[in-house]
Each structure stands twice: as structure tokens, then as C-alpha cells.
Amino acid sequence: TEFGPSQPFKGAK
């Protein structure tokens, strides 16, 4: 998922 810990900037933005 793009909200996962791999892409925290995705979930943050």
C-alpha cells in the first residue's frame, strides 16, 4: 500500500 511504512510521505501528504 502507498500508505505503508515504505512510503510514509504518501500517507503524510
From Swiss-Prot:
Q: Which Enzyme Commission number(s) are listed? A: 3.13.2.1
Source domain of life? Eukaryota
The record's Gene Ontology biological-process terms are: one-carbon metabolic process
Which segments does the entry list as coiled coil? none
Keyword annotations for this protein?
Hydrolase, NAD, One-carbon metabolism
- Top-level EC class: hydrolase
> GO molecular function terms here?
adenosylhomocysteinase activity
Q: Which cofactor does it need?
A: NAD(+)
Write out the pathway annotation from the protein's UniProt entry.
Amino-acid biosynthesis; L-homocysteine biosynthesis; L-homocysteine from S-adenosyl-L-homocysteine: step 1/1
Describe the subunit structure.
Homotetramer.
The similarity comment for this entry is: Belongs to the adenosylhomocysteinase family.
- Which named protein is this? Adenosylhomocysteinase 1
